[in-house]
Every structure is written in C-alpha cells, then in structure tokens.
Amino acid sequence: MGTILDEIVEQKQREVAELYEIYTPVKTKRKTHSLVEALQQFTVIAEVKRASPSKGDINLHVDVRKQVGTYEKCGAGAVSVLTDGQFFKGSFHDLQTAREESNIPLLCKDFIIDKIQIDRAYEAGADIILLIVAALTKEKLKELYSYVLEKGLEVIVEVHDEQELETAIVLNPHVIGINNRNLKTFEVDLSQTEKLGKRLNEEKLLWISESGIHSKEDIIRVKRAGAKGVLVGEALMTSSSISSFFEDCKVNI
C-alpha cells in the first residue's frame, strides 16, 4: 500500500501530462523579490491554505486578496500559496491573485516534479519554488534546482529527516525548509526542527521551520533551535486574530 505522498506524486504525474497538452510557457523576464533578503531577520512566511489531506477543509472560501493583504499589513516577510488542486484545493489562480495583491516574496507551494510546473509558477508570479526531497530522485532534484536558478528564482529545499538533509546540503541551496510533518504519514513532530537544525547551524545554512507551528511557545522553540523563519498555514487560516499571531512571533529569546 502506498503512502499519501505516493498518491500525491502519482496525481502530479497525471497533471503534468495534462499541462503539456494545454499550456505553452511564455518566455518573459520580470522583477523578483528575495526571500533570502527577508530572512536576514526572523520572518513569517504566511500561507494561503484552503484545505489539506490531514485536516480536510480549513478555510475553503477564503478571499485570497484580503488574506494576503492582511498578512502583509501584519508584517509577513513572505507569502506562500498552495497551488495543488486535488489535495489542498489551491490553484495557480490563487498564486496569481496573491501576486497582484502583494510586493513581498511569493512562494509556490506544490509538489513540483517537472520543469513545466516551474514555468507555470513563474508566469503566475512566484519568486520562490519549493522542491521536496522526499518527492524526487537525487537526479531530478538537481535538474529542477538548476532550472529554478536559470529562471532567476530562489529555492526552498524541503527535508524531513537526516538522509534528506544530507541530499539537500550538497546543493548548498538558498534556503532549507525543515518540514516537521512526515509526508508519508502526515504526522507532525516539532522535534525534527531541533534535531536537523543543529546540523544546519554547523553548516551555517539559512533555514526555516515548517508545519505544526501554532503558538508563542512553538515560535520560541524554533527560534531557539536557530530557525530564521517559520512557514505557517493552518494556524493563520483559522485564526480569529492574525495580528496577535504576528505579535507572538516578535518574542525575544
């Protein structure tokens, strides 16, 4: 029996085949916004996330324009947009809407397995592409990483365990994202940030913590581990006071 990640990647393969039939990349150059610059101080990457396989519908009918405007007003250093439709109910249209609303760095959050998805994300306004080590062979990861750089975009290389981390370090990427969620089981363990963070601190690499961050205590914990930022979706999409969450992120350690 396959994992949730296996199921998602199989769906992506079908989507990529369809994309080649209906989409022709446009060769254009545009201005981009840097996440690396934003991460010179502790940064919240605030996510637009309508749903997920683990939680079901989170905020299905969110007004993307309004949500992104609120994030920027509250002090987000970057915005992440889920573009997966099947499992997260997102779209490239959501990404494009976020770009129209915001001038801060914009992350395309998806399960990228092919260059054509990167072309589509670029055209929709992404500044940063997420590449997930668990979803790719080493060869494909290298190929897609190089292609993102060719497009003039930045990369977050996402890892969950020590083996994936070693694969990521070889690339010397702009940013490494420690995903506290195991994409095979979708279970969350914040101690992954502390475990893997030690190695990244030794390597003096820029890194962020992703998933499972809901409270001031969680923020303190990942800051102490050395994270330069956090990617937060569900907590913000269900919050009755987004500004309060951002205030909690300013806590000194």
From Swiss-Prot:
<keyword id="KW-0028">Amino-acid biosynthesis</keyword>
<comment type="pathway">
    <text>Amino-acid biosynthesis; L-tryptophan biosynthesis; L-tryptophan from chorismate: step 4/5.</text>
</comment>
<dbReference type="GO" id="GO:0004425">
    <property type="term" value="F:indole-3-glycerol-phosphate synthase activity"/>
</dbReference>
<dbReference type="GO" id="GO:0000162">
    <property type="term" value="P:L-tryptophan biosynthetic process"/>
</dbReference>
<dbReference type="GO" id="GO:0004640">
    <property type="term" value="F:phosphoribosylanthranilate isomerase activity"/>
</dbReference>
<dbReference type="InterPro" id="IPR013798">
    <property type="entry name" value="Indole-3-glycerol_P_synth_dom"/>
</dbReference>
<dbReference type="InterPro" id="IPR013785">
    <property type="entry name" value="Aldolase_TIM"/>
</dbReference>
<keyword id="KW-0822">Tryptophan biosynthesis</keyword>
<keyword id="KW-0456">Lyase</keyword>
<dbReference type="Pfam" id="PF00218">
    <property type="entry name" value="IGPS"/>
</dbReference>
<protein>
    <recommendedName>
        <fullName>Indole-3-glycerol phosphate synthase</fullName>
        <ecNumber>4.1.1.48</ecNumber>
    </recommendedName>
</protein>
<dbReference type="InterPro" id="IPR001468">
    <property type="entry name" value="Indole-3-GlycerolPSynthase_CS"/>
</dbReference>
<dbReference type="InterPro" id="IPR045186">
    <property type="entry name" value="Indole-3-glycerol_P_synth"/>
</dbReference>
<dbReference type="InterPro" id="IPR011060">
    <property type="entry name" value="RibuloseP-bd_barrel"/>
</dbReference>
<keyword id="KW-0210">Decarboxylase</keyword>
<comment type="similarity">
    <text>Belongs to the TrpC family.</text>
</comment>
<keyword id="KW-0057">Aromatic amino acid biosynthesis</keyword>
